[in-house]
Amino acid sequence: MQERTEAFSARSLTASLLRLPVWAQATVVYAVSRVVTLLLFSIVLRFQAPTFWSDDKPPTFFEFLGFWDADWYRRIADEGYPRVLPLTDSGDVAQNQWAFYPLHPTIVGWLRDMTGIDYKVLSPIVSHIFALAAAIAILYLFRRHADPARALAGTALVFFFPAAAVFSTGYSEATGIFFLALSLLCVDSRRYLLAIPAVLLMDLARPIGVAFSFFMLIHLLDRIRRRQTEPYPLLEVLASWALGVLSCFFAVLQPLGAWMLTGQFDAYRKTEAAWTGHTEVFTQWLTASTRYLGWWGPIALAVLILLFVWGTLGPTGELIGRTQKQFLFGYAVYLLLFFTPQTSTLRLLLPMFGLAMVQARSRSRTALASALIGFTVLQLLWISLLWRLVPPTGFPP
């Protein structure tokens, strides 16, 4: 009897939630996820030692949310970008602001100047606002290819994902994910011209532009291939190719800006190399897999790639939608070519939010609840093991 009552209550709650407007559904799910995340941050804060980010004193809550790369964004708001690249004692380019994109710190800096509120307070607030907008955009995108209940479940999985804790910090992930979701929504609905400003702002927020350009190439070739079954009128041809070309240009705005301001053509590349000590193409994945798993490493890497392809193209990926599948492959190619596996890997997977629909395909409430509980536990580990700094130094999450 008790089990029936609990099941009835769960169904009633779900039905009530699904009767709300779409934006309200996303807001409720997002709000619950942020309450959980902020609670986890407050728990871990109790164990955070004083750091240089908090002037060698126990950090306040907002200072804690401003650790790691969030401090680089603050420096952009305070100092701008360097015109002369800083150098290490060995003569290599040192870590500097050029590795971080300007949109988030610019918005927060403007608000700080207008209101007088401290940057460290405003930055996570701005992140929360953009993350809410992202939740709404993602839910609308998911609903284009899945029923309302499973689309909402997928949205919940996105915002309970372990690295989604970063949406509550001074990082620019929330800003980038919002404009990415908006761009994909525009492309999926064939509103290519509306996607242009969204892609521009996305590329000013996060380095997603190269991956988006790969995606647009896949998308455009697919539109040509399928033009017999899906009409591809001249206006859509012109608009879609305009978006594709502009996507390539927007993707290099940050490197171009670094070149123009410093006078050094490879300023951006050398700045990126300051974090890893090198820049490689694809071989960095083989190197990392071998380092951690020995000769099993490349085999494990191949298995992961095959699982990704099967999960996306197989029956489990039926709710992802063609546009999101194309972006997932474009982004996966980008990661394999240019990204070096490190402590930031989970965070770099956030743009692949479409994969949440693989798990959301199940109609089992038990499976969904188990996934959300598991993600919550992993989020606590992400905050305590990666976000919390054990002085004197560490690696960014």
Task: Indicate residue ranges for each PLM-predicted region.
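Membrane-lumen/periplasm interface segments of specific transmembrane helices
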Residues: 36-49, 213-318, 322-328
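Extracytosolic helix-loop segments that constitute the early lumenal/periplasmic catalytic or substrate-binding loops
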Residues: 53-60, 65-93
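Membrane-interface transmembrane helices that cradle and orient dolichyl/undecaprenyl
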Residues: 146-148, 183-194, 363
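Short acidic/glycine- and proline-prone juxtamembrane loop motifs at membrane-interface regions
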Residues: 169-175, 345
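Membrane-interface alpha helices of multi-pass inner-membrane proteins
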Residues: 180-185, 193-220, 246-250, 333-334
